Swiss-Prot record:
Function noted in UniProt: Required for maturation of urease via the functional incorporation of the urease nickel metallocenter.
Protein name: Urease accessory protein UreD 2
Molecular function (Gene Ontology), one example: nickel cation binding
Main location per the UniProt record: cytoplasm
Pfam families for the chain: UreD
Gene Ontology CC annotations of this record: cytoplasm
InterPro entries in the cross-refs: UreD (IPR002669)
Organism annotation: Brucella ovis (strain ATCC 25840 / 63/290 / NCTC 10512)
């Protein structure tokens, strides 16, 4: 059970406000994509506030048959005692793009913690771009996320997770003032074969996050996971060069995942804009390699 993770042992007290996981604090979202003759459609949609999805839109000029789904929250952020769950299921030969409306803010906490579980299933020859906006942990927030992926060997997942250092420009600045951020990602093939598990825990009060070998002078961290067949991964690994540019405030590189699962990219930046640009470059290269399609022009407000 996610709430019993060892790193949460010191945060088991109940909030004085609404009880943990009560109505309005137990968000749920299920998205199911199916293939129709002309395009992929969002065939299944179950939602429980604060998580909301209205409908799929087809605004991607590079892939006009790609359903694009934006996850909305009407809560103004994730609060102490919140328990969120997201399920995304792609049937064989489907394609989808899922993102969030804006950054996810983990609000300041004085009791308990917040969790989010993500369960993603990809059928044969399916393709999913899951690229949410950044996570911004506020002062004394505690957040644990667990992502479970079941993927067919012929499918592709582009998964991005961006963690900000906090509210950098709030007051005198909140850099690494949160209590806990924990994220676990596990992937397995549809036959049950485990591919890899990655987990990172950040507890700024227990160690200097800005030390050399951790964040250093950077304030934005992105974990971008590309699960794709080996032929795609091999070509991308040879064509995407690492970058270290302190003048632009950006550094990133790639490594191979175990069991020929794909590639793992780590991106670090001083601000979110160069990190977003790096994500877009990797995303565009992966899409071109796997689907043959290009990305549309970036939105002016992106």
């Amino acid at each position: 059970m996610l709430g019993k993770a060892r790193e949460l042992a010191n945060y088991q007290d109940e909030p004085e406000q609404l009880p943990t996981g009560s109505f309005g604090k137990n968000a749920f979202l299920r998205l199911g994509f199916e293939r129709r003759p002309e395009r992929t459609v969002l065939a299944t949609l179950h939602r429980r506030a604060p998580l909301i999805v209205q409908q799929a839109l087809y605004w991607d000029e590079g892939m006009p048959t790609l359903p694009c789904v934006s996850i909305i929250s009407n809560a103004g952020g994730i609060l102490q005692g919140d328990r969120y769950a997201i399920e995304i299921d792609l049937e064989p030969d489907t394609q989808a793009h899922v993102t969030t409306q804006s950054a996810t803010r983990i609000q300041e906490m004085d009791a308990n913690f917040a969790t989010q579980t993500q369960t993603i299933t990809l059928g044969a020859n399916s393709y999913l771009e899951y690229i949410p906006h950044p996570i911004i942990p506020h002062k004394h927030s505690r957040f644990v996320q667990q992502t479970e992926v079941t993927i067919h060997p012929t499918a592709t997942l582009i998964y991005s997770e961006v963690l900000m250092a906090g509210r950098k420009y709030y007051g005198t600045g909140e850099l690494f003032h949160y209590d806990l951020f924990s994220s676990k990602f596990h992937a397995a093939h549809t036959d049950g074969t485990s591919l890899f598990t990655e987990k990172f825990i950040v507890e700024p009060a227990r160690g200097n996050v800005s030390r050399l070998g951790a964040m250093g002078s950077f304030h934005v961290f992105c974990n971008l996971i590309l699960l794709t067949p080996k032929t795609h991964a091999d070509r991308l690994f040879e064509t995407i060069d690492p970058v270290f540019d302190m003048d632009e405030g950006i550094a990133w590189g790639a490594s191979r995942l175990p069991n020929d699962a794909g590639l793992l990219f780590k991106v670090m930046g001083m601000e979110s804009a160069p990190v977003r640009a790096a994500i877009r470059k990797i995303w565009e290269a992966a899409r071109q390699e796997v689907t043959g399609a290009s990305l549309p022009e970036n939105f002016l407000w992106a």
